[in-house]
Amino acid sequence: MATKILALLALLALLVSATNAFIIPQCSLAPSAIIPQFLPPVTSMGFEHPAVQAYRLQLVLAASALQQPIAQLQQQSLAHLTLQTIATQQQQHFLPSLSHLAVVNPVAYLQQQLLASNPLALANVATYQQQQQLQQFMPALSQLAMVNPAVYLQLLSSSPLAVGNAPTYLQQQLLQQIVPALTHQLAMANPATYLQQLLPFNQLAVSNSAAYLQQRQQLLNPLAVANPLVATFLQQQQLLPYNQFSLMNPALQQPIVGGAIF
């Protein structure tokens, strides 16, 4: 009797265990590499280790942060290469004309090459051209400084003509150096022609040549103003070379004794 009761209890236990039991599917044992094919990425990351998730997140952030500067650098390098290519093409296009200019006029070629690198040329073209013209007259300036330092210093001072038109000013200064010598040579070689050139500029010389000569001697010699005899002597000395008869016969040129004067 007791054996039957134990057998019934065992059967009841088996029935209860059979109703509560469940079967584990084999797909749950699949590797994690197959999971992303059936689940979204976030769900697949959830099955991974937290350290692996943090590492993969750092890789994604670093790639996104470095991608934009690299693209900008690539664009800048492409733009620089494009500009360099255009400049090279333009240089090759103008190279024959520049070579011809260098052969024909080296000064103009060098001036054109230095024009862009000169701040004065970019700021004030007129001043730069004036400076270039002044450099052409540097030999004349050096000669003027050696012959007459006073005039050279005057040129360097604040002269309106020197600042406005340096070549014209230098030409006038050189003429002032040459004209006295030419005038002196003309007066020594041909006094009549020299006086004839001076006559139209003085009414006294036109009306009375003797008085004009006397006036010039009085202006040049203060002793003639104080002593009329000296003025007469100088007048005679001035008029003596213009006596045609005495010029033809030097024996008739009687010297004047100066003892009575002094």
UniProtKB/Swiss-Prot annotation:
A GO MF label: nutrient reservoir activity
Signal peptide: 1-21
Effect of residue 21 to V: In fl2; loss of processing of the signal peptide and floury phenotype
Main location: endoplasmic reticulum
Keyword Signal: yes
Location in or out of the cell: Endoplasmic reticulum membrane
Protein family: Belongs to the zein family.
Protein name (record): Protein FLOURY 2
